[in-house]
Swiss-Prot record:
Protein name: Versiconal hemiacetal acetate esterase
Keywords, ordered alphabetically: Hydrolase
UniProt similarity note: Belongs to the 'GDXG' lipolytic enzyme family.
Substrates-to-products reaction catalysed: (2S,3S)-versiconal hemiacetal acetate + H2O = (2S-3S)-versiconal hemiacetal + acetate + H(+); (3S)-versiconol acetate + H2O = (S)-versiconol + acetate + H(+)
Pathway this chain belongs to: Mycotoxin biosynthesis; aflatoxin biosynthesis
Originating species: Aspergillus parasiticus (strain ATCC 56775 / NRRL 5862 / SRRC 143 / SU-1)
Xref: PANTHER family: AB HYDROLASE SUPERFAMILY PROTEIN C4A8.06C (PTHR48081), ALPHA_BETA HYDROLASE FOLD-3 DOMAIN-CONTAINING PROTEIN-RELATED (PTHR48081:SF8)
EC number: 3.1.1.94
Sequence motif: Involved in the stabilization of the negatively charged intermediate by the formation of the oxyanion hole, positions: 85-87
Active-site residues, record numbering mapped to chain: 154, 255, 285
GO biological process: aflatoxin biosynthetic process
Protein function: Versiconal hemiacetal acetate esterase; part of the gene cluster that mediates the biosynthesis of aflatoxins, a group of polyketide-derived furanocoumarins, and part of the most toxic and carcinogenic compounds among the known mycotoxins. The four major aflatoxins produced by A.parasiticus are aflatoxin B1 (AFB1), aflatoxin B2 (AFB2), aflatoxin G1 (AFG1) and aflatoxin G2 (AFG2). Within the aflatoxin pathway, the versiconal hemiacetal acetate esterase aflJ converts versiconal hemiacetal acetate (VHA) into versiconal (VAL).
Keyword match Hydrolase: yes
InterPro entries assigned to the protein according to its UniProt record, in alphabetical order: AB_hydrolase_3 (IPR013094), AB_hydrolase_fold (IPR029058), GDXG_lipolytic_enzyme (IPR050300)
Length: 314
């Protein structure tokens, strides 16, 4: 039987002996499943050591904390990014994506601030979004009012869009130089406009092919408690997308969120927003973060696309 996976991902799945896929029964089972998977990856493959050439500083800010990254040989003229980690608004954190942020800071030659936003279900919407806005304003003051590249993965990509749009709606569009959204959530499945529903099939097609299964995504939305049609969560519906300066989106072809990326690109194109877009057929959600040797070229290509986008926005 022909595999839907790209060759390098297929090699990883064969070696691992399973397709990484979170159970979706409830939040406890998701957290347990993710913990087990992360432990297996660490034991069998190991995660690369952090890049110590990138300097870090932790900052406490009104109940949340931030980690600031500065690449080697920084001059103070580098672009500034604000990064939101993934995890369906309920898990993950700055520490979990520290290595990834160090790579972004070095490869993109940018000063980066990673946000430890509050998680659901303990803090429901709009807690994480409010934290994003607070972090953006803090980063602005720290880095001489330099416009920010708002960046994020998965739910973090959603927060990057939401924070940018909230700033725009608060007459602070000048604080945003662009959005870098990696496999982002852009719309609640129940909020997809009727005329676009035929194009929104990834939740069915990729339900069990990716770490963020269809069932897990439902749990994430249920925990976050954002209204289905809220325009800072279902950002596809926001009436002022045309105010976004520049946007980069990375799509993973076997992701439940594949069509979130595609529909957002279509909406941005209609609004005549400058867009860079990279698609990776045959790869599932966050494939660029998994530590397996066959995925090295995929990871380098993926990060190269991110770096190119940051240069374009700077």
């Amino acid at each position: 039987m022909e595999t839907p996976f790209a060759g390098p991902w297929h090699q990883f799945v064969e070696d691992l002996g399973q397709t990484p896929c979170l159970p979706g029964k409830d939040l406890d089972s998701i957290l347990a499943g993710w913990g087990q998977l992360a432990g297996t990856l660490a034991t069998r493959y190991g995660f690369p050591p952090p890049d110590e050439s990138v300097a870090t500083e932790d900052v406490q800010l009104d109940g949340l904390w931030l980690r600031c990254y500065t690449p080697a040989n920084a001059t103070g003229q580098e672009p500034v990014g604000l990064y939101f980690h993934g995890g369906g608004w309920v898990m993950g954190g700055v520490k979990e994506e520290d290595g990834f942020c160090r790579v972004i800071s070095r490869q993109c030659q940018m000063r980066l601030v990673s946000v430890e936003y509050r998680k659901a279900p303990e803090t429901r919407y709009p807690g994480a979004l409010n934290d994003g806005v607070s972090a953006a304003l803090w980063a602005q003051s720290r880095y001489e009012n330099q416009p920010l590249v708002l960046m994020g993965t998965s739910a973090g990509g959603n927060l990057a869009f939401g924070t940018a749009l909230r700033l725009i709606d608060q007459d602070m569009a000048d604080k945003v130089s662009g959005v870098v959204a990696l496999a982002p959530i852009t719309v609640h499945p129940d909020a997809v406009p009727e005329h676009l529903k035929e194009q929104y099939t990834a939740y069915e097609e990729n339900a069990e092919l990716t770490v963020n299964s269809r069932a897990a995504m439902q749990v994430f939305f249920d925990c976050y408690k954002a209204p289905v049609d809220d325009v800072y969560t279902s950002c596809l519906l926001h009436p002022r997308l045309l105010a976004l300066p520049k946007v980069y989106i990375a799509e993973l072809g076997l992701d439940t969120l594949r069509d979130d990326a595609r529909l957002m690109k279509g909406a941005l194109d209609t609004a005549k927003v400058p867009v860079m877009y990279d698609a990776y057929p045959g790869y599932p959600h966050c494939s660029f973060m998994f530590p397996f040797k066959s995925l090295g070229e995929h990871q380098r290509t993926f990060l190269g696309g991110v770096a190119k986008a940051v240069r374009w926005m700077s």
